[in-house]
């Protein structure tokens, strides 16, 4: 169970360290990336292209779009899913280029899921923040393991997004 963690690579300053706080399915992950808000937004909203790039997203398909709202089908498979492919349908609301909110429409083995991505301009780039609230449908004896594995996945996801945002 994670309360707060700061992870910095070799030579990273505290300003560029990624942070994860929260526990038991309620998390906030942040990282600073030296890119424009528009570049961060472009990467964050390449929904279908994220399949295979993000550590847990195996498939992604935009099912419908109406203005700033869209429905997205995703299949997750990662250590926190215990190797099982888990399908979910999400409703996303975009507020370009600053915020993306999402909520669960339907899903396998997920009681509830909601969250947001926020892009905030800071000196030298943007602060990317991901807030997530998830209640998995897993047996009680597996919940702590699920959350530990989810925390590791959140940190890895932030690292991957930063790497993708830094690509030309």
Report the location of each language-model feature.
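Short strand-connecting beta-turns/loops that link adjacent beta-strands
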Residues: 36, 65-67, 97, 122-125
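Hydrophobic beta-strand positions in extracellular immunoglobulin-like domains
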Residues: 33, 76, 132-134
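Short, surface-exposed coil-to-beta transition loops
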Residues: 26-28, 84-89, 111-116
